[in-house]
């Protein structure tokens, strides 16, 4: 049986650490990638097609899309939805980066045997604790794992282990290089956070210089000089970093409008009456997205949770929804095409008059408003074909 390894990723954006991860994996590599909205509650810096192209250029064989109701979820639900998609495509292994060197297969075995007891333990914990805090206490209680508060990949890896329990998937943890959310562009392996910050900083400086020299600015979010980041990005995809990009600033006026005029925010996914009141009050004074998050979050409602809630509000995600039955393909190599042939009835390669997932497609329409240079994200788009593998 051929080894087929799944990777769950955002590639926001793709960098040398991601290239390193792909290079450590043998056999066929299937990536389940977030579309245009991220797990931490933010729009992707580059659209899903650009990021899929980056992944294919650096060794992925098949890139499929996580629907927005999976990609913008908390860790456990994000992991569960992504693992289910990959398992449906026949993966034998799941690879991921982690700051920890523990055996995640043992963790999955523990959860398979004691999962019901572990979930009951979470329910017994005090309500004032956030869900991530409850989850960490659960892992500590049943496995002895310790957390230092600065291991986000380790937290996700535990969610993957939980999602993979009982599914006959071998878990392959690859030691992470570089710091996950470091804001500094260190030599070699820079974090996605640092790259996003640097990209927008460079763009602002470029636009200021352009205006000072009386040159026309066709788009405020296009970067042409990539020399400052070339040492931190795989050479094969450096040019793609000049693609149109966006961030929350582009959507904040839309979000303000939505919060102000919607009299029933509690009908939005995971928004309750308490949060609705807090949001209605905070939006009157918040000058930007970060200020709004700062004013709304509490110990119980973490910043990450608030960012996701604001994403649900902007995208009008209802409390009840169904996940799409088919899997949307963004791109494939020659090897990946063989996997598609084996899963013909499970995949959708082109979205036309018959929709794939209405919520994701509407979310993509809103995403397109973030930059006038974004192309149509779904209707008529065909998967990217890579000739590399």
Curated annotation (Swiss-Prot):
<dbReference type="GO" id="GO:0005524">
    <property type="term" value="F:ATP binding"/>
</dbReference>
<keyword id="KW-0547">Nucleotide-binding</keyword>
<keyword id="KW-0819">tRNA processing</keyword>
<feature type="binding site">
    <location>
        <position position="176"/>
    </location>
    <ligand>
        <name>ATP</name>
    </ligand>
</feature>
<dbReference type="GO" id="GO:0006400">
    <property type="term" value="P:tRNA modification"/>
</dbReference>
<feature type="binding site">
    <location>
        <position position="153"/>
    </location>
    <ligand>
        <name>ATP</name>
    </ligand>
</feature>
<dbReference type="GO" id="GO:0005737">
    <property type="term" value="C:cytoplasm"/>
</dbReference>
<protein>
    <recommendedName>
        <fullName>tRNA(Met) cytidine acetate ligase</fullName>
        <ecNumber>6.3.4.-</ecNumber>
    </recommendedName>
</protein>
<comment type="similarity">
    <text>Belongs to the TmcAL family.</text>
</comment>
<keyword id="KW-0820">tRNA-binding</keyword>
<dbReference type="InterPro" id="IPR008513">
    <property type="entry name" value="tRNA(Met)_cyd_acetate_ligase"/>
</dbReference>
<feature type="binding site">
    <location>
        <begin position="8"/>
        <end position="21"/>
    </location>
    <ligand>
        <name>ATP</name>
    </ligand>
</feature>
<dbReference type="Pfam" id="PF05636">
    <property type="entry name" value="HIGH_NTase1"/>
</dbReference>
<dbReference type="GO" id="GO:0000049">
    <property type="term" value="F:tRNA binding"/>
</dbReference>
<dbReference type="GO" id="GO:0016879">
    <property type="term" value="F:ligase activity, forming carbon-nitrogen bonds"/>
</dbReference>
<comment type="function">
    <text>Catalyzes the formation of N(4)-acetylcytidine (ac(4)C) at the wobble position of elongator tRNA(Met), using acetate and ATP as substrates. First activates an acetate ion to form acetyladenylate (Ac-AMP) and then transfers the acetyl group to tRNA to form ac(4)C34.</text>
</comment>
<keyword id="KW-0694">RNA-binding</keyword>
<feature type="binding site">
    <location>
        <position position="97"/>
    </location>
    <ligand>
        <name>ATP</name>
    </ligand>
</feature>
<keyword id="KW-0067">ATP-binding</keyword>
<keyword id="KW-0963">Cytoplasm</keyword>
<dbReference type="InterPro" id="IPR014729">
    <property type="entry name" value="Rossmann-like_a/b/a_fold"/>
</dbReference>
<keyword id="KW-0436">Ligase</keyword>
